[in-house]
UniProtKB/Swiss-Prot annotation:
SUPFAM superfamilies: Phosphoenolpyruvate/pyruvate domain. Belongs to the PEPCase type 1 family. Forms oxaloacetate, a four-carbon dicarboxylic acid source for the tricarboxylic acid cycle. This is Phosphoenolpyruvate carboxylase. It comes from the Bacteria. Pfam families: PEPcase. GO terms for cellular component: cytosol. The active site is at 144, 586.
Amino acid sequence: MQPADKDLPLMDDIRLLGRILGDVIREQEGPRVYALVEQVRKLSVSFRRDADQEADRALKKLLESLSTGQTVGVIRAFTYFSHLANLAEDRHRIRRRAVHERAGDTQEGSIELALARLRAAGIAPQTIAQTLAGSHVAPVLTAHPTEVQRKSILDAERSIAQLLAERDDIQARARLYDGANDALTPRALAANEALLRARVTQLWQTRLLRYSKLTVADEIENALSYYEATFLREIPEIYAALENALGQHPVHSFLRMGQWIGGDRDGNPNATAQTLQYALGRQAEVALRHYLTEVHYLGGELSLSTRLVQVSAPMQALALRSPDRNEHRQDEPYRLALTGIYARLAATLKALTGGEAARHAVAPQNAYASAQEFLADLRVIEDSLTAHHGAALAAGRLHPLIRAVQVFGFHLATVDLRQSSDKHELVVAELLATARVQERYADLPEAGKRALLIRLLNDARPLRVVGARYSAHAQGELAIFETARALRERFGAEAIRHYIISHTETMSDLLEVLLLHKEVGLMSGTLDDAAARNQLIVVPLFETIADLRNAAPIMREFYALPGVAALVQRSGGEQDIMLGYSDSNKDGGIFTSNWELYRAEIALVQLFDELAASHGIQLRMFHGRGGTVGRGGGPSYQAILAQPPGTVRGQIRLTEQGEVIASKYANPEIGRRNLEILVAATLEATLLQPTKPAPKTFLAAAGQLSQASMAAYRALVYETPGFTEYFFNATPIREIAELNIGSRPAARKASQKIEDLRAIPWGFSWGQCRLTLPGWYGFGAAVAAFVNLQGKTPGAQLALLQRMYRQWPFFRTLLSNMDMVLAKSDLALAGRYSELVSDARLRKKVFAAIEAEWHSTADALSRITGDQQRLAHNSALARSIKHRFAYIDPLHHLQVELVRRWRAGQDDERVQTGIHISINGIAAGLRNTG
């Protein structure tokens, strides 16, 4: 099949959805608006596809002449088209995967291909199962200030995606019949199109924007929709596929879900003990309602009679405990048992959440004390079915339910707690001052803090003074710890396992959190107590370049303290360490950020390998990756395989942020594919990755590139006078901050300093103006400096970089991501944004520097990879970008125009609305944001 042929169904879907959108616009807004949108579309397409300069000039002139009302109408049209094009592309990805599977081809990143590679390497299924038994893979959903999708929009788009899937099914069935005599297919397609038209009309008449600030509760509800749509059903399917592939070897529940929403307090004063309670209450409700539904349907399926089969004694006992006294079911033990199980689940739902089951139980029953107790009842049913040759009956619904309970329990997902180290210090200082243990704790040198904290950790007495009044901050923070302890008792130990310390800079940052754990009873005993345990894993988050360099030294000092290693070992023997991609990039640029992350991982693995001689502590890296390449984004499969040798070992947690969640997990089939990628990459990185470190020449070269890259990046961002002014004017950062798109502020402090700006809106803003600067800046300068290093031959230096690209996954993946970012950038459009900077000298100086480095980086990539065109090895993405640009361009032009009007004082609410819708449309069109 020719490349163009295989994409014909995609083009058909885009044309269909575009035609329906056009019809809806004409119907809803009138023929004039439709004609205007069409005129803009044709001019933009002519310029992008044919390089028609006359069309470009006509387009700019037309867009600048539009009234505010016309502008908003055009922006809405192209924004919705971006959303619909995304749905068509997602459908095509699923379609192409099905084609590969039917042909017996296995896609890169699939579990099938990973297992085939393991078999080819001589690795037995038993070894794979044993590896998985000791593994832990967890995507962690987080809410961020740039998540621009409303749940109402996501729900409507899910409906459209389902209708596109049904349309494929109709056409597939039609191919089995004689088209000339097929009267059914045209009717079915027409009915399908009518439903699509209704959903597109719904989209057009649904607000894209929120008119009130998103709350933490809203973010929790948004996240829960992905469990209902994807995770609860697709994760058990992945396990079933693995068990089928591995034969008789059972697969441990290593793939689990994590969540920050409700427990992430870093920079978010709206996250409190109450939101944490709400998060776990709602999570439990979603899990339990899923189980109730499955148990109900299971009761309908297992109508087996003891007149025909003999059930096991435990099964008979379970049936006898049922409150169901219906005489028609007395010979149907499975139904009786499931009626009782349903009643107990309904009681559990009531006890844990206060909610009522959708279908009333036949009689009140005691709630389950734990998910394990519920699981034990399901196991009784499974064992009995297997004993009388009813295993086939268990495969369809019972096995997925059992796996779901193993994975999701009554808590659904593990909620991480996170707070900044300086906030902990404030609480500790207040406790110590109030107890008259230490005045002005914060002023102590690091050594003094450590000595005091260790002494207090070895003292069984509490610090809180009865009757003393503490600040609202101290009360709020202590309430979080106390609530966490109570919620673990209520929902199970898996409900909350990790306590993350943002901005970990010193060892005292870790000790302060241990002390607070001890104060509220999360840590039992004292540090020198041989029976002491801590309920939570204390997770340092190393974010800046300096902190990444200090990560291993800090952890070495921490574990050298008497009692620490023994405490961790007694508490489960796990140590997660989180690495921040976002702030390290904002601090030092793309190459240095990635290089220092790489070095930190190697150093940490070496440290814990040394500790293994005396204490068996499992190290697990937690990657704080964002959606954009500048924040650690990019394909997960390549990213995991590019980790340093020996750093995965079956253990990985990684954040899924912003629009990435919707693009990866809104569609169940695509969600499953993305989850499979995490599993496949973890298996390959653990069992196939070479254990030898990269050649010393490669490591030395990367160090030199990093030094030069960081110097170039910081020279622009932190050392160029006026750069901050340029950034705040040449990007829509101020307008992004006004959007009601997240529950926490876009900046940690109210200032105009780059240092105080969150890394997420920083990257989001550069994407909106199409410079994508955090994803590439500094690399061109670094390569030029490296190739022309004094005393070295330029040809030999370049040849070394080319060898690194061919042989070193870390270097190849990093350059591949830069290649993608450059392909999505557009200097001409970025130049339009730079015109928003009123200071002409500043504008020219900064933009000229950025433009020169862009060309330098593009040239460096071409020389190293040998590819003169961007995305030479990813033709599907290259085509997608080419088609999309023509529809995103008008949004950029109109955004610049509206931002200019808004900043000039035009206070028409429609101007602000237009800006905000354009932000949404561009984010959807580029398919990555924060």
